[in-house]
């Protein structure tokens, strides 16, 4: 009787920037015959997305420690203790062969308990500036991976492999092939994230209204559920036509359609823009911890594939001046530069590392 296939425990939660790379890894591991379980929280985006992917979700009662009030800080040791105990129970019950952490609230307690029980622990940091949890876990992890260079000190021994992105994005045709027959007005994609971005919703339509009507690009704008009405009103008042939705379900199709994207600079977004091969105007979220979105954007700005405008500096005049001077031929050059920086094999490299970390007596079952 053959042994069951290896069980890999993915730890990620809180935001899509942590969860989507974890889901990409889970899909790659399943294709290789592995079983996958997930450790997260009940309040993060993983509570919906992970069960929808058919993955068993285990949750910890923990929240972030940074930027909290005094009461939350005083209760933090108690909350952490409960979460460590809950993580220990999960580890003992599941007995995973390998544990992989992507960051987020549950990753800290889970990673500590995995290490204490001698389970191989792998850590992947998505941002150019490593988050607090991953900085801690990097000290005890068996292997550390990153989406951008220099996220950790050299002493950590980190491998830069890029960020896992969804296959449908990596599989898009190269920019030159996609744009070969395009004529007429430019195609502008505006992504405010699933929750929207108030600055983009207000400034983009005002900037477009400053352009002659015949020179305005075709626009698709993801406004977010909370700020959809604001965006609809802003475009209406500006007299600018646009396709405005709360959320774009098929983002790969939207990337394939666009000539240019205006967006925040979360690690996953930057990785997807590179994988798709798109020039971008990044507007980093101004309240991101350690200003990591500016560092993320710098990866493609340095490559000559993108622009970066700080949120406070994004005015209709500045954005309108930039958009008014763009031509598709010049954008294609930036698109190809972006595609050259992509790491389409990131998820396969990470999946291979997981299997290599499986104890030898279990590896044959994969």
Residue ranges and their predicted role:
Residues 5-13, 30-82, 225-227, 310-312:
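Conserved nucleotide-sugar phosphate-binding/catalytic loop shared by glycosyltransferases and other
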Residues 18-29:
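Short amphipathic alpha-helix
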Residues 35, 45, 56, 115-175:
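Active-site-proximal region of nucleotide-activated glycan assembly enzymes
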Residues 44, 49, 53, 174-261, ...:
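Donor-nucleotide binding loops and adjacent catalytic segments primarily
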Residues 86-100, 107-122, 135-140:
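Glycosyltransferases and closely related glycan-assembly transferases
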Residues 96-98, 256-270, 278-279:
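Acidic donor-binding loop of glycosyltransferase active sites
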Residues 331-344:
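A short, well-ordered alpha-helix in the C-terminal region of glycosyltransferases
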Residues 343-366:
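C-terminal alpha-helical cap of glycosyltransferases
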């Amino acid at each position: 009787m053959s042994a069951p296939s290896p069980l890999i425990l993915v730890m990620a939660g809180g935001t899509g920037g942590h969860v989507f790379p974890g889901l990409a890894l889970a899909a790659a591991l399943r294709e290789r015959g592995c079983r996958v379980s997930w450790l997260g929280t009940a309040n993060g985006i993983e509570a919906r997305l992970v069960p929808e992917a058919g993955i068993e979700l285990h949750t910890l009662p923990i929240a972030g420690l940074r930027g909290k009030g005094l009461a939350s800080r005083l209760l933090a040791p108690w909350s952490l203790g409960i979460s460590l105990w809950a993580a220990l129970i999960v580890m003992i019950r599941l007995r995973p062969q390998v544990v992989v952490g992507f960051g987020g609230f549950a990753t800290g307690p889970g990673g500590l308990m995995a290490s204490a029980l001698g389970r191989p622990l792998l850590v992947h940091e998505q941002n150019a500036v490593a988050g607090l949890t991953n900085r801690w876990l990097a000290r005890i992890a068996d292997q550390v991976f990153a989406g951008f260079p220099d996220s950790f000190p050299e002493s950590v021994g980190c491998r830069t492999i890029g960020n896992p992105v969804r296959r449908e994005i990596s599989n898009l045709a190269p920019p030159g092939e996609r744009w070969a027959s395009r004529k007429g007005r430019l195609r502008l994609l505006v992504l405010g994230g699933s929750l929207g971005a108030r600055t983009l919703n207000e400034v983009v339509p005002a900037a477009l209204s400053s352009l002659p009507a015949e020179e305005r690009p075709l626009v698709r704008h993801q406004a977010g559920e909370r700020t959809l009405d604001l965006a609809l009103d802003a475009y209406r008042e500006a007299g600018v036509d646009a396709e405005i939705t709360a959320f774009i379900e098929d983002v790969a199709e939207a990337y394939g359609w666009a000539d240019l994207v205006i967006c925040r600079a979360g690690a996953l977004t930057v990785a997807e823009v590179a994988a798709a091969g798109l020039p971008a105007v990044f507007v980093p979220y101004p309240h991101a911890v350690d200003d990591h979105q500016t560092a993320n954007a710098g990866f493609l700005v340095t490559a000559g594939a993108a622009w970066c405008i700080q949120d406070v500096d994004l005015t209709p005049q500045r954005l309108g001046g930039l958009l008014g001077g763009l031509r598709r031929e010049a954008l294609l050059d930036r698109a190809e530069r972006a595609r050259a920086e992509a790491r389409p094999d990131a998820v396969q490299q990470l999946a291979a590392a997981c299997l290599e970390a499986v104890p030898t007596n279990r590896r044959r079952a994969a």
